Amino acid sequence: MIEAKDRLIDKMLESGAILFGHFVLSSGKESDYYINVKKVVTDPDALELMAGLIAGLVQRVGIDFDRVAGPELGAVPIATAVSLKTGKPLVIVRKKPKGYGTGSQIEGDVKEGDRILLVEDVTTTGGSVLRAAEVLESLGARIAAIAVVVDREEGAEGSITSKGYTFLPVIRVSELLERKETVKGRESD
């Protein structure tokens, strides 16, 4: 698992998924760095690593689930890869209900009592993924766990666990930044 995690971090660094400068995050917070996992989900090897790491983490912790869900847009490819890896059906959670057709806020089937593994690309405060959890729970589903590729370590874990959810970060930003410094140090030798 550690080797796969390091390979994923390396792919993130190589793809330019970590940017430095001034950014406003979806939470409204300002940051001097931005993690754009969307830059790396277009790499099939990185996507496979993400799916394998999430599936392995969930299995090790002993989480049982019936479906994999991801909020649009960033988590959809990751949730799809986890769905393929685990053989569990996929559910996509829209930010807002469609303004046409059925007006649904989800794509895919959710039944009363379904245990959902909710997947997210990056968490800061946890607000976006918690809104997705509310949508799924309003349909009678239960959140088995929330797995995230990168946790920025800015409050998401506390927000998510305070609601009673199991929080499973694959990579914490401190690990990512530490790896960046290690790689940078090797390159300057």
From Swiss-Prot:
Gene Ontology process terms (BP) = 'de novo' UMP biosynthetic process; pyrimidine nucleobase biosynthetic process
Q: Name one Pfam family in it.
A: Pribosyltran
Q: Which UniProt keywords apply?
A: Glycosyltransferase, Magnesium, Pyrimidine biosynthesis, Transferase
Superkingdom assignment: Archaea
Tell me, in a sentence or two, what this protein's role is: Catalyzes the transfer of a ribosyl phosphate group from 5-phosphoribose 1-diphosphate to orotate, leading to the formation of orotidine monophosphate (OMP).
Mind listing the GO molecular function terms for this protein? magnesium ion binding; orotate phosphoribosyltransferase activity
Q: This protein is called what?
A: Orotate phosphoribosyltransferase
Catalytic activity reported: orotidine 5'-phosphate + diphosphate = orotate + 5-phospho-alpha-D-ribose 1-diphosphate
Q: Provide the taxonomic classification.
A: Archaea, Methanobacteriati, Methanobacteriota, Thermococci, Thermococcales
Q: In which pathway does it act?
A: Pyrimidine metabolism; UMP biosynthesis via de novo pathway; UMP from orotate: step 1/2
Residues annotated as binding 5-phospho-alpha-D-ribose 1-diphosphate:
94-95, 98, 120-128
Listed EC numbers: 2.4.2.10
Q: Which family does it belong to?
A: Belongs to the purine/pyrimidine phosphoribosyltransferase family. PyrE subfamily.
Record-annotated disulphide pairs: none
Record carries keyword Cytoplasm: no
Cofactor(s) required for function per UniProt = Mg(2+)
Subunit relationships: Homodimer.
**Binding-site residues, orotate:** 124, 152
